A protein has these predicted regions:
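N-terminal Rossmann-like NAD(P)+-binding subdomain of aldehyde/semialdehyde dehydrogenases
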Residues: 1-122
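Conserved small-residue-rich beta-alpha loop and adjacent elements
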Residues: 106-172
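Alpha-helix C-terminal capping segments
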Residues: 141-152, 175-177, 195-201, 219-221, ...
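Short internal beta-strands
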Residues: 152-162, 266-273, 279, 350
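Conserved NAD(P)+-binding/catalytic subdomain of aldehyde/semialdehyde dehydrogenases
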Residues: 178-249, 253-256, 260-265
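A conserved active-site cap/scaffold subdomain adjacent to cofactor or substrate pockets
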Residues: 230-302, 306
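C-terminal core of ALDH-fold dehydrogenases
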Residues: 320-428
Length: 428
């Protein structure tokens, strides 16, 4: 049974329990991942294929998925699924197009020029979980902003199914989004191949996409060798409501995240004891009809809660401290809380903006900071796939005008060679 508490300070213990979820990992995971990374670095594709046979499928039909197989999904797939994905792509593209940045240049009468270049990364690796729980939406949410950013090549890795073939829904999404290459491999070995490069898999500049604890650990260990999107923790949702909320909707939304895994967190903060009580009833009722009932029950019992707040302002304060991945506001005037909620991955406003709307269709990215990191991290965006560099051009006159200040600061820092680099030019 989901716990019910009042917002009297006791919620702090709940926050500590939620934060501890990330420490609940096997102590041997990092050791195992390090061994896999070293093996792939030394032995390349041979090691990747060996681990694929061991962990995923002993008889993988191919390593690199042929381009014809990818394109064939466009005609072989369920037309309704194709149309649904195209509608999602349209919305995601429209939203992310607004994020695109341009470089700039500044000059003045002295002839100096300073500016910034913005350009897409050369190659990006996209990890997509495979198997029966495959998510084509992950392809959309990662590949679309990368394409808009100007990334030259997207290399996707995804584990094979047990019969040695790729998941067709994943291939369909890859075809629709213009992914350049697809390899059938997964786990830490696939992440290592993208980071180091092999004979067949290109070395990339950045790796994005969700995965299990082995994938997340590999990304963490390889950060610095390659850039990554973020270290994603278990999924989480926080719902804020007043007395106008429909408990049926609230319960459905809490369970939509609780079903992800047993470490998922689902919390309701409400000003209404009626909403709290009726939500408990709805949770019990709706849970019986859902396929992942056991997972939902476990996550709600261990990392779920209903918190009764004095008012919506207190509810917002608690939300900012928790900094959730997903935050729903179901209240009489939900839009008035936008400016009060600073620490959140994605904000869903009103009775008819449930979290799954953002997972697939609305347009904003569903790759979001978790585990309280929304205090300082942002969702995946076009900006995640660009690099910026500055440039400086000074004329002789412009340098002479600046020389005295530069030399003074350099000598104060006792960097006399810095000062000398300026002085030899202005003395000519």
């Amino acid at each position: 049974m989901i716990r019910q508490i009042y917002a009297d300070g006791s919620e702090i213990e709940l926050f500590k329990e939620i934060e501890k979820r990330n420490s609940e990992i096997n102590e041997n995971v990092e050791k195992t991942v390090k061994e896999i990374l070293a093996d792939v670095k030394a032995n390349g594709d041979e090691a990747v294929k060996r681990y694929t046979a061991k962990f995923d499928c002993p008889d993988c039909k191919c390593y690199r998925v042929p381009e014809e197989m990818i394109q064939d999904t466009l005609t072989e797939a369920d037309p309704q699924l194709v149309d649904a994905l195209l509608n999602c792509i349209e919305n995601i593209t429209a939203y992310h197009q607004k994020q695109k940045q341009n470089g700039y240049m500044m000059t003045d009468d002295s002839g100096k020029i300073i500016g910034q270049r913005v350009r897409g990364l050369d190659k990006v690796g996209l990890y997509v979980p495979g198997g029966t729980a495959a998510y084509p939406s992950s392809v959309l949410m990662n590949a679309i902003p990368a394409k808009i950013a100007g990334v030259q090549e997207i290399i996707m890795v995804t584990p094979p199914l047990k019969d040695g073939t790729p998941n067709k829904d994943i291939l369909l999404a890859a075809a629709l989004c213009g992914v350049d290459k697809v390899f059938m491999c997964g786990g830490a070995q696939a992440v290592a191949a993208l980071a180091y490069g092999t004979e067949e898999i290109p070395k990339v500049a950045k790796i994005v996409g969700p995965g299990n604890i082995f994938v997340a650990t590999a990304k963490k260990l390889l950060y610095g060798t390659v850039d990554i999107d973020m270290i994603a923790g278990p999924s989480e949702i926080l719902v804020l409501t007043d007395d106008t909320a429909n408990p049926r909707y609230v319960a459905a939304d809490l369970m939509s995240q609780a079903e992800h895994d047993k470490l998922a967190s689902a919390v309701l903060i409400t000003t209404s004891e009626r909403v709290a009580k009726e939500t408990v009833v709805e949770l019990e009722k709706q849970m019986q009809t859902l396929s992942r009932k056991e997972i939902i029950e476990h996550s709600l019992n261990n990392y779920g809660a209903i918190i009764i707040a004095q008012d919506m302002m207190q509810a917002c304060d608690i939300a900012n401290r928790l900094a959730p991945e997903h935050l729903e506001v179901i209240a009489e005037n939900p839009l008035e809380y936008i400016g009060r909620l600073d620490n959140v991955g994605s904000l869903f406003l009103g009775q008819y903006s449930p979290e799954p709307l953002g997972d697939y269709y609305a347009g904003p990215n569903h790759v979001l900071p978790t585990s309280g990191t929304a205090r300082f991290f942002s969702p995946l965006s076009v900006d995640s796939f660009v690099k910026k560099s500055s440039y400086i051009y000074y004329t002789q006159q412009a340098l002479k005008e600046a020389a005295e200040d530069i030399i003074l600061v350099a000598e104060r820092e006792r960097l006399t060679a810095h000062a000398n680099s300026i002085r030899v030019r202005v003395e000519d």
